[in-house]
Amino acid sequence: MSGEATAAVAAKRSVRAYAVEGDKTMDIFDVQSVDENILRVRTPLLFEIGEELSVRIVDDSSTRDTFVRVRAHVGPSDMRVTELEILS
């Protein structure tokens, strides 16, 4: 599936992702696309490659808490997309 098609699927499904720290959720991710186990997000924060984060993924039909690992930062610096690998 092309990046544009995947982004369209994410938009249609209204997928959102939030960083979770303790009992707080932080709206710091703009989900660009979702594949089977990869979230591609834009964020104002720069996470380290390999860093693991607790996140809440919400779509039209479900909510789940999981962990992700920062896999890569791709694209030009002004349009940087962070790839998050879903671990569980």
Give the location of each predicted region.
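Structured alpha-helical
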Residues: 1-88
